[in-house]
């Protein structure tokens, strides 16, 4: 997962999976346009080197549709055929269903919207970087921990850590500063787990 738009160290991950014959499934949901800066010999975008790459195009993403949408990419023909079938109710041919699948076909309206918005992704990511740089320069309080992001981070979220959360929230509210919680709970704290 390239959390908050910051590239994970794919070089290190690929070394581990190569030794263990594991496929790499790349969660690119928050990293549209991020460069893999763990490998300095090439400047490939996140999602272009894994066995399977998944992109969420939920409206709140850096590249978002107007409704739920997503993309899966692969250069493996076997994976491609299975994914194509699963996203079309398990169908391999018209009226032939070999698998249990779901209706996950991207509709034409969402495709048109995304195609138009894609043209602005680079420009919008640059704007996010400029804003993040302003935060980095101006958040000087040593009680606020700023995360360390990759060089090509596209800042899906700008995240900070604070010890006295409730006190900090009151300060933000009093100062009329907008804030939010991206992940209010760790996944292992949820009832399902």
Regions found by a protein language model. Give the residues of each.
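Hydrophobic residues in beta-strands of the RecA-like P-loop NTPase core, especially within AAA+ ATPase
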Residues: 1, 25-26
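Active-site phosphate/pyrophosphate- and oxyanion-stabilizing loops and adjacent acidic/basic residues
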Residues: 11, 44, 68
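Proline-centered loop/turn at the N-terminus of a beta-strand
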Residues: 21-23, 52, 178
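A cross-family glycoside hydrolase active-site/sugar-binding cleft signature
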Residues: 27, 56, 182
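Radical SAM/AdoMet-radical enzyme domain recognition
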Residues: 35-52
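PLP-dependent aminotransferase class I/II
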Residues: 1, 6-15, 19, 31, ...
């Amino acid at each position: 997962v390239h959390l908050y738009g910051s590239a994970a160290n794919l070089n290190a991950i690929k070394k581990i999976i190569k030794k263990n014959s594991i496929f790499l499934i790349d969660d690119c949901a928050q990293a549209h346009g991020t460069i893999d800066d763990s490998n300095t010999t090439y400047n490939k975008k996140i999602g272009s080197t894994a066995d399977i790459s998944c992109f969420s195009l939920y409206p709140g993403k850096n590249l978002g549709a107007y409704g739920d949408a997503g993309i899966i990419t692969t250069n493996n023909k076997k994976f491609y055929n299975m994914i194509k079938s699963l996203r079309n109710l398990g169908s391999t041919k018209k009226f032939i269903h070999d698998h249990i699948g779901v209706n996950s076909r991207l509709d034409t309206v969402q495709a048109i919207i995304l195609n138009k918005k894609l043209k602005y992704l680079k420009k919008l990511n640059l704007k996010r970087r400029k804003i993040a740089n302003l935060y980095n320069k101006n958040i000087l309080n040593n009680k606020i921990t700023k995360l360390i992001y990759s060089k090509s981070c596209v800042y899906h979220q700008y995240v900070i850590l604070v010890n006295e959360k409730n006190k900090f929230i009151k300060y933000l509210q009093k100062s009329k500063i907008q804030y939010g919680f991206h992940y209010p709970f760790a996944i292992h704290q949820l009832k399902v787990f």
